[in-house]
C-alpha cells in the first residue's frame, strides 16, 4: 500500500501532460496560438512545483499532529487537487482565448496542491522503511511510477469510452482518491522525534536542485513540442525561427 499513491499521482500527471493539457490548449487558444498557450502553462506549472515542493516537504518534517506528520498534507492536498481537476474539466471553452487565464489558475492550483500531498508523501519511505529494506521499497516506488505513466499515456485510447476529456478527469479523480485513501487508511506513521534546528543552507541547496530540474523540465517539454510540431510550436512559444526544422 505504501507505493499505491505513486501510481495514482504518476497516472494523474501522465494523463494531464500527454492527453488533456495539449488537447485543451488547442481547444482554448486555437491552432494558431496553441503552442504559446501550452508553453506558458507548462512553464508556470514548473515554477510552482519548484517553489512549493521543498518548502512543503521541509514544513511537514517539523510539524506534529495527532494524525502524524504526513497524513494531514496528503488528505488536504488530494482534496484540493481533486477540486482543481473538476475546474480543469469544466472551465475551458473551445475557441475562447479568454478562458486561458482561469485555466492557467486552475492548473497552478492542481500543481500546488499535488505538491502539498506528494512532497510529504515521498518522505514516508525513510519514515517507515528500515535502511536495509529501502532498496526494495524504492524499487516498488519505481515500478508503480512506471505503471502510472504507462496507464496515463494509453488512457487517450479510451477517451471515447470515457466521454472525452471530462471523463478522463473524472478517472483521474477516482485514481487520486483511491491512492490517497490506501495510504491514509493502511499506512501507519511512526511517532516522530522532535525536529532538529532548521538548516537554511540545506534548503538553499534543495531549492537550487529543484530550480535546475524545473529549467530542465521546461526545456525538455519545449523540445518535445518542437519535434511533434516543428513548424508551429517554437515560433508560437518564443516568437523565433525554428532552427530545428529541416
What role is predicted for each listed range?
Residues 38-63:
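Central cavity-lining transmembrane alpha-helices of secondary-active solute carriers
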Residues 89, 93, 151-167, 222-233:
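Transmembrane alpha-helix termini and helix-breaking/packing motifs in multi-pass membrane transporters
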Residues 32-36, 131-140:
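Loop-to-transmembrane helix entry/capping segments in MFS-fold secondary transporters
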Residues 44-50, 135-160, 176:
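Glycine-rich segments within core transmembrane alpha-helices of 12-TM secondary carriers
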Residues 174-193, 214-222:
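C-terminal membrane-cytosol helix-exit motif in multi-pass small-molecule transporters
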Residues 74-97:
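C-terminal ends and interior cores of transmembrane alpha-helices
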Residues 21, 25, 116-129:
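Intracellular juxtamembrane helix-capping segments at the cytosolic ends
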Residues 1-46, 220-246:
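Helix-loop boundary and gating motifs at the non-cytosolic
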Amino acid at each position: 500500500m505504501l507505493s499505491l499513491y505513486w501510481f495514482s499521482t504518476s497516472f494523474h500527471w501522465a494523463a494531464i501532460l500527454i492527453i488533456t493539457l495539449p488537447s485543451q490548449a488547442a481547444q482554448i487558444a486555437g491552432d494558431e496560438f496553441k503552442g504559446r498557450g501550452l508553453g506558458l502553462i507548462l512553464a508556470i506549472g514548473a515554477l510552482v512545483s519548484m517553489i512549493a515542493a521543498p518548502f512543503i516537504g521541509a514544513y511537514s518534517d517539523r510539524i506534529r499532529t495527532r494524525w502524524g506528520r504526513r497524513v494531514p498534507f496528503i488528505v488536504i492536498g488530494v482534496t484540493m487537487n481533486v477540486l482543481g481537476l473538476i475546474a480543469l474539466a469544466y472551465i475551458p471553452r473551445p475557441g475562447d482565448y479568454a478562458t486561458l487565464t482561469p485555466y492557467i489558475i486552475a492548473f497552478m492550483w492542481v500543481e500546488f496542491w499535488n505538491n502539498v500531498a506528494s512532497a510529504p508523501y515521498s518522505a514516508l519511505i525513510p519514515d517507515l522503511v528500515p535502511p536495509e529494506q529501502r532498496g526494495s521499497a524504492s524499487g516498488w516506488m519505481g515500478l508503480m511510477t512506471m505503471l502510472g505513466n504507462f496507464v496515463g499515456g494509453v488512457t487517450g485510447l479510451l477517451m471515447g469510452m470515457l466521454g472525452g476529456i471530462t471523463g478522463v478527469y473524472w478517472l483521474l479523480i477516482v485514481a487520486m482518491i483511491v491512492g490517497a485513501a490506501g495510504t491514509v487508511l493502511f499506512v501507519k506513521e511512526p511517532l516522530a522525534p522532535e525536529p532538529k534546528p532548521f538548516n537554511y543552507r540545506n534548503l538553499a541547496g534543495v531549492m537550487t536542485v529543484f530550480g535546475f530540474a524545473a529549467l530542465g523540465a521546461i526545456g525538455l517539454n519545449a523540445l518535445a513540442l518542437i519535434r511533434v510540431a516543428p513548424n508551429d510550436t517554437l515560433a508560437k512559444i518564443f516568437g523565433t525561427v525554428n532552427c530545428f526544422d529541416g
